[in-house]
Amino acid sequence: MISRIFCAIAAIFIAGSAAASDVRRVVTGLDARNHAVVLFDSSIPLKQDSPVLSSTNFWITDSTPPSLSMQDTANRPIGVSPPENGTKFRLVEFAPLDPATEAKLPPEMIMKGVTHPPQRGIPVKHPMMHRTRSLDYAVVLSGEIDMMLDDTSVHLKQGDVIVQQATNHGWVNHGTQPCRILFVLMDSKEP
């Protein structure tokens, strides 16, 4: 129930800005008197990472527990994995991928910025397959997408929630509309 409410609020907030491809990010903190204030309030553009996806980082931490430094920690290269002992809060927009284009994807196109390619010894069934050494929480905000795993695929729609535990996976949008997914990635130990 709570996850559905979160999904609905997040979908209204983020999917509503889909036309502009920018997302408003509001970050709060404390001033010198320990009063809650707005530190950052601005539009964050999605950056095209590849022909099939765009993304942006909202916030990144470099330690657990995180430092509340009041500095903008998201202003760094996008990449996929969170920093060691850190977290990454990000939005990814997957463009529709028609079968003809999908068939032409080069096998070496492991997603840009992935520090952990698929598990060794397991054949890669799609160029978008990859792995992050992280525990990931994800919410499909808009659109539909197929999450590929080693031996199966799962079709996901708006409002679906994913908990991914450092597994091989890939994302392919076989629909006609972009799919936006909100991710929180937390660094983990190797499984």
Provide a role label for each language-model segment.
Residues 26, 30-31, 35-42, 48, ...:
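Double-stranded beta-helix
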Residues 19-71:
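N-terminal leader/capping segments at the start of a protein or of a new domain
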Residues 123-126, 130-132, 137-158:
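A short beta-strand-loop-beta hairpin characteristic of the jelly-roll/cupin
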Residues 43-45, 90-132, 165-168, 187-189:
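Conserved short histidine dyad/triad with adjacent acidic residue
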Residues 144-146, 153-157, 166-190:
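Ligand-binding loop in jelly-roll beta-barrel domains
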Residues 15-16:
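N-terminal signal peptide c-region/cleavage motif recognized by signal peptidases
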Residues 1-7:
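Bacterial N-terminal signal peptides that target proteins for export
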